[in-house]
Amino acid sequence: MAAELRMILYEDDSVQVQYVDGSTLQLSPCGSEFLFEKSPPVSAHPLEQPERIRQRTHFVISTYREQLQRALDFRNSSATCPFLSETIIPSERKKHIFIDITEVRWPSLDTDGTMIYMESGIVKITSLDGHAYLCLPRSQHEFTVHFLCKVSQKSDSSAVLSETNNKAPKDKLVEKTGKICIRGNLPGQRLKNKENEFHCQIMKSKETLKKMSCVNGTEGREELPSPGTKHTCVYTWVKQCWSVAACPEEWKYPLSLALHFHNKISNMSKIDAHITQSRFLTSDISEERGKVVSVLPRALSLSCPVPHLHRWNFCDSLLQRQSDEYSYPELVKMVWYKGVTYRLTHQNMNSIEIYSGDGSVFKSEGAYFGNYFTYYSIQEGSGKREEKTYSVNNLPPDRPGSPFTVGSLIKQATRILQHCVKMRLSLSHNYRICCWKMVPGINDSNILPLVLKESLIPSVGRFLAYSDDKVHAIFLDGITLTLNWNFSSPIEKRQVNQGLNLGWCKLTFPDGQEQLIQIEHPEPYERYVTTVTSWCRRLTQTSPREMPTHSSSSVLQENWSVASELEKIQKFNLLLENSGILNQISNKKNEQQSFDHYKPGSSETLLGEVNENRVSIALKKTSEILHDIDCLLSNSKK
């Protein structure tokens, strides 16, 4: 079985795995279906299509079971909702539990309970019920969280356990929580309990360590019931790894506990008390104080309700395997390549973190687009921190014997960032349509972005602003420009280009060629960039009533024109029918037709005989009604 060369997790939680022999495996965003593409033999014709196997994940055959299991573990490590098929999970990883676990309760911030400081510098926070725990390493750039999750069920499953029949005996280990345990001796003098806040137990015996609620022993708490036990749920431990800078909502409180506890331990032991990443969540500790309960992520169902939304990428894997250039069809969330992990965040701006595998981390810095990378590392013996900053335009030469090359890592990260910028500037919005996010009966207009503002500037071009913060400009010379602009940021706090979500824009030339342009240095396309950014600033400086909004009623507000025109026609027809003008015209016409037998040519004066006063009155009323309708619709739109 071939080893993995590259594993990619996209923003919609789909996975693509590339193997060293050229074969690829793709997982759907929901994880319920996979496509395995075998590598073509050497003697195969260049136009010959490779063999492809498409199967349901729940019914995978043994040939692809191991590869699929590793791909699912990679997906679940950073996915919003895991996919856990009972047929793929090994028996030793299954837990049969009598209760339905949907949330966990963490210790309060005032009473530091169930917190362990290990000899390696890892801080572990365990929930009061023992169903989840969080581990924060000494570097504090990323953290891992383990939690019990029920395996994926059928979509029509209605088996819900009642609370009265699901009272499981409490684990004895959970009852013995409320203590902070330090594994090994800290450097320097032993901790002193000056403020009577810590009850520390220094454990030296390996036998005692095994009995404690540690990382190796926590997952073995639940005991397997007898095979004949009824009304049990199958659970498994899910391990997820997240960046401290982009912590999900459900893990913010335990992470704030870990940072707070690590800071106390560092201050008391008089070792390195500088917390590099504490700036991300230190201000949020007081806000997260009341959120002691975390709702655990739920596994997706075994079958996908909308499998027609599954998209498969067919490309020349042989050419991509021979070079580091890789074509990513979607917005990337995480990439694993040759033992190095690249983790991206797309919240305010694109940023990337590089985990080389030896404990060191590279982080992209600079406005908008990773112009610099900062290197963080901690020496194992002394615990001394080391920081270096590298410029993308001036990378250091390769060092012989180094476990990794700084230049190659940063270049690979820059290419991934460039791809993410192109995807965010793309007008194709397919990445927003995700199968597991679809709700039955949802309106398709809620998925695609709306046109908030459209302007036609004479001798310049056409400008459009969309509800997903995209701005698209079509110039008269055939060049189109696309950029992201945040219209919702406050005007009083905005700087010159503060509305920019990305520091780059995309130019598309008449021949179809595309080019990324840095907005701060747009030469020789400064005229296009300046024109669009000036239009965006004027749009955001309008009155609050004219400001683009993202309200849920925007669909109705943008589709008012067709309905209003139809209503105008109906009102006008109703006025004509009730005014009696049509009846008079019809009667006059009938009389005239009978009279035309004797006086031909008199039909030209038929309309002139209608009472002019009634026509003017009807037209005046019609004009007033149409004016009132326009005022009403314009006020409702504001």
UniProtKB/Swiss-Prot annotation:
Reported effect of changing residue 266 to R? In a breast cancer sample; somatic mutation
User: Which residue windows are transmembrane per the record?
Assistant: none
Q: Which Pfam families match?
A: C5orf34-like_N (PF15025), C5orf34_2nd (PF22833), C5orf34_C (PF15016), Polo_box_4 (PF22834)
Entries under PANTHER family matching the protein: CHROMOSOME 5 OPEN READING FRAME 34, ZGC:153352
* Name by which UniProt lists this protein: Uncharacterized protein C5orf34
The gene from which this protein is expressed is C5orf34
